[in-house]
Amino acid sequence: MSIPRFLKVTYGAYDNYIPVSELSKKSWNQQYFSLAFPKPPRPGKKRRSLPSQLQNNTAPVIDEEKLGVHRPPLWMHRSLMRISERPSVYLAARKGLIPKPLHFGKGESKSVGTHKSLASEKTKKEVKMKKDGFEAKEKTALKTDKEGSPKPAKKNIPRDSQKDKGRVSSDSEGEKAGVKKGSKKVKNTPKGKDSASESEGEKAGSKKEAKTTKKGSKDKVSATESGGEKAGSKKEAKATKKGSKDKVSGTESGGEKAGSKKEAKTTKKESKDKVSATESGGEKAGSKKEAKDDKKDATSSQETLLSTAADKDGKKKEEKPVKQSSKSKDTVKDSASEKGDEKKEDKKEGKKEKKKKDGEGKEGGKKEKKDKKDKKDKKDKKDKKDKKDKKEKDKKDKKDKKDKKDKKDKKDKKDKKDKKAK
């Protein structure tokens, strides 16, 4: 056959697939046609109103007199007498809530029409109301948009300024580092950096002070000097409690750097340092480290004051032999023997510093506890005083109110007397 067995049929919005065979097509069409177009009433038959189209679903009032006269036929079953169709919830919702009409006798069909017209009027009113509401909302939204438009412009200004600030900061890292240092300085910051000469001594001093605190940072330093001196610095690193991984850099002699690093490593936890070739780079790094360290320990700055005095003397003595070794690179053996002596001295100094720190830490702890206790006591006293003052104030207020009331009462009595007299 040329006609396909199954067809995809779509009805309105419903896009579901309905396979219809050739045999059942006729009955299927008949059924659906009857749904769309109801059959015309047969002549001589009364039209029965459907309960789904009536709002009152109350049980019909049965007149017993009429039933007595007109009895239902014997063959009719009780289930057939009842109307099986339930009132449709869908139609009720469509119509809207309409007050239940009185029970109609014969003119039931007329009442249905009136209900429908009422419902249509109601729906029209609702639609109008909705439209008005929507328009009002739109107007308010427009107003808010107009008012809100200047606000973002104001907000943009600080953003631009922030960007400018960012550019400035990226241009001068050194300045920023200085500012950080200034803001986060504790009362007892060491001020002995300037005493050293303009050579590596300055770098060493700043690094040393940074490393005296318990926690340090990691360092990469790249080398251009002799291999013998590098080897010496590596040996020294291993000798300390917790050594650091060093790659030595710069335009100056590696021996000088080794000397300065050695002193720094005597503290509890050593750090791995990034040191750039130029002096400014070294100073920046030192200042940033100091800023971080100040955050962590305020107490450590006191310890540095004690340690720097001893370290400076040792550093100045060590710098002289190291400078000679840098001038003549052949005298590596002599410097090695000196380094051995310096290591021993450093270890001794480290032990002394450790003992001092332990003592100071205990004393600091006691002090802090005492301070806390004093603060608490002061606060308690203040609270008690405040409570007392509050109570007194309340009493005063009550007294004032009472006095006012008494005065008012007296005045009222006086007025009444005057009126009576008149």
UniProtKB/Swiss-Prot annotation:
Lineage: Eukaryota, Metazoa, Chordata, Craniata, Vertebrata
Keyword Glycoprotein (UniProt): no
Region (38 X 3 AA repeats of K-K-X): 25-421
Origin: domain of life: Eukaryota
Main location per the UniProt record: cytoplasm
Primary gene name: Cylc2
Cell compartment(s), UniProt: Cytoplasm, Cytoskeleton, Perinuclear theca, Calyx; Cytoplasm, Cytoskeleton, Perinuclear theca
Compositionally biased tracts (Basic and acidic residues): 118-149, 157-178, 191-298, 310-368
InterPro entries named among the record's database cross-references: CYLC, Cylicin_N
Name of this protein: Cylicin-2
One biological process term in Gene Ontology: maintenance of cell number
